[in-house]
Amino acid sequence: MTKVLVLYYSTYGHIETMAEAVAEGVRAAGAQADIKRVPETVPEDVARTHHFKLDQAAPIATPADLEAYDAIIVGTPTRFGRMASQMASFWDQTGGLWMKGALIGKVGAAFTSTATQHGGQETTLFSVITNLLHQGMVISGLPYNFQGQMRLDEITGGAPYGATTIAAGDGSRAVSDNERDGARFLGQHVAQIAAKLSA
């Protein structure tokens, strides 16, 4: 069975919600989906003061976990147009995997959230994708046969480079149905590609 890791970091829960939708899509394709998160680096008292969502059920990932999967779908909120430092720190610890070529040929994809419609979604996705390319991974985006990213009747996330959501500056906007659909589509699409490549 094709194994897919949904690896994420979430501050207020938006990326956690997207990760769950991605995993639903993976499972719909008949693949195994494991959801793991990277460690929080913000001190707990600071995180509580700023209302971080600390009760996330997903187990903490280690870089060594990545080798076991056929595909890795990475989710992170934006920080000034790039991935959050927590996710960057995790990937900075994957030098040993790079030295062994352990991730070469695996499928990689990305999803993100931003505060606003033009808050750096695509640059954040590319900041993730760059790491995956350096590891030798085969990149998948969110193809345009997911028609939800073409909608003009509502403000919504979605890009050909990955699934996205808009959270609002204070995290008050919930992930929309359309954005969940995009995340599910991404998960299913990646799982289907990984199954073909590992056959």
Swiss-Prot record:
Cofactor dependence: FMN
PROSITE patterns assigned to the protein according to its UniProt record, in alphabetical order: FLAVODOXIN_LIKE
InterPro entries: Flavodoxin/NO_synth, Flavoprotein-like_sf, Flavoprotein_WrbA-like, FMN_Rdtase-like_dom, NQO
Catalytic reaction equation(s): a quinone + NADH + H(+) = a quinol + NAD(+); a quinone + NADPH + H(+) = a quinol + NADP(+)
Residues at which FMN binds: 10-15, 78-80, 113-119, 134
GO cellular component labels: membrane
Residues annotated for substrate binding in this entry: 98
EC id: 1.6.5.2
A GO molecular-function descriptor: NAD binding
Domain Flavodoxin-like as annotated: residue spans: 4-190
Name of this chain's protein: NAD(P)H dehydrogenase (quinone)
Organism, as annotated: Gluconacetobacter diazotrophicus (strain ATCC 49037 / DSM 5601 / CCUG 37298 / CIP 103539 / LMG 7603 / PAl5)
